[in-house]
């Protein structure tokens, strides 16, 4: 399944343009003057569980492996719930064809027309000012990681890459529908297009790199680092570099959470739980478990 097509986090940023960097320095939601929905928060506590919406097919954050849902966001959902004295009730879902605003509608503030959802909170939501303004029905807050695209390449075949032109004549790859694919296809004024191979999944593109089928691949840093761990490959043999492209956000993008707009007490509780995980080192350990270096948002 195509995570970037279905999730659209990376694809969303193809259309986004340059985000406001200053906003992300203060991305946490400010609650001054708000009237928390204590009654709804009490219902959650009485139920004993926190319903958490997670994307399907988004390794290393959330994916079904051997019939078990696993990944960074899965572990984070469990840790947040435990910190709040609750158990996690996972609601995995496929992304809506209408994009991430449709995902927020289905999984946070309204529910799917087939009766699935809404959850109490959704993870892996881009914390971006323009996106927040477009989705007033939800609170988007608590960034916990910064993601971005990198170019991983085979050092035995390419000595150094500092610009797209350095890939001339080399077979490259990326995931279908991703911003990384668009960057390669448009890089060097389109001169690389004939050598770009498109794969159904980022993992497949990375395996093609490791096997020698291609010489370089454009994926997210988390996908790259996780693949190094699971495939037992060396970063010295397969290093990464960051290339500038009009279709890639220059500083990557922050990912956080979303709750329904009137659930401010819940958002406060989640913010506090996340901070506790950060201070104890548990958040970093969760990422490290999957081979991913957490990047401050």
Language model: regions and residue ranges:
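N-terminal secretory signal peptides that target proteins for export/translocation
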Residues: 1-16
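Bacterial N-terminal signal peptides
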Residues: 17-32
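Extracytoplasmic small-molecule ligand-binding "clamshell" domains
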Residues: 42-119
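Periplasmic-binding protein-like
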Residues: 56, 145-150, 232-271, 291-297
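Bilobed "Venus flytrap"/periplasmic-binding protein-like clamshell domains
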Residues: 69-83, 150-200, 222
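Extended ligand-binding regions for polar small-molecule ligands
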Residues: 74-83, 155-158, 165, 170-171, ...
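Acidic, polar ligand-binding/catalytic clefts
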Residues: 90-165
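A ligand-binding cleft/hinge motif common to bilobed small-molecule-binding domains
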Residues: 123-134, 183-187, 210-211, 215-249
């Amino acid at each position: 399944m195509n995570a970037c097509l279905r999730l659209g986090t990376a694809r969303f940023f193809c259309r986004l343009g340059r985000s406001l960097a200053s906003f992300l320095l203060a991305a946490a939601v400010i609650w001054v003057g708000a009237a928390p929905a204590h009654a709804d928060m009490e219902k959650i506590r009485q139920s004993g569980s926190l319903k958490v919406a997670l994307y399907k097919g988004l390794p290393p954050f959330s994916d079904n492996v051997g019939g078990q849902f696993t990944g960074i966001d899965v572990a984070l959902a469990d840790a947040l719930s435990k910190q709040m004295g609750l158990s996690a009730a996972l609601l995995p879902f496929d992304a809506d064809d209408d994009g991430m605003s449709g995902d927020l509608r289905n999984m946070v503030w309204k529910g799917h027309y087939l009766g699935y959802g809404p959850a109490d909170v959704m993870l892996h939501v881009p914390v971006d000012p323009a996106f927040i303004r477009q989705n007033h029905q939800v609170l988007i807050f608590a960034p916990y990681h910064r993601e971005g695209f990198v170019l991983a390449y085979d050092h035995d075949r390419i000595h150094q890459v500092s610009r797209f032109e350095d890939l001339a004549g080399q077979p490259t790859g990326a995931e279908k529908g991703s911003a990384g694919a668009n960057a390669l296809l448009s890089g060097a004024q389109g001169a690389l297009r004939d050598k770009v191979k498109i794969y159904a999944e980022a993992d497949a593109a990375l395996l093609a790199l490791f096997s020698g089928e291609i010489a370089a691949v454009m994926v997210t840093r988390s996908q790259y680092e996780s693949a190094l761990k699971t495939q037992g490959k060396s970063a010295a043999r397969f290093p990464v570099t960051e290339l500038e492209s009009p279709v890639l956000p220059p500083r990557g993008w922050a990912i956080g959470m979303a709750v329904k707009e009137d659930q401010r007490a819940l958002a406060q509780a989640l913010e506090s739980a996340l901070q506790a995980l950060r201070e104890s080192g548990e958040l970093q350990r969760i990422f490290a478990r999957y081979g991913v270096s957490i990047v401050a948002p």
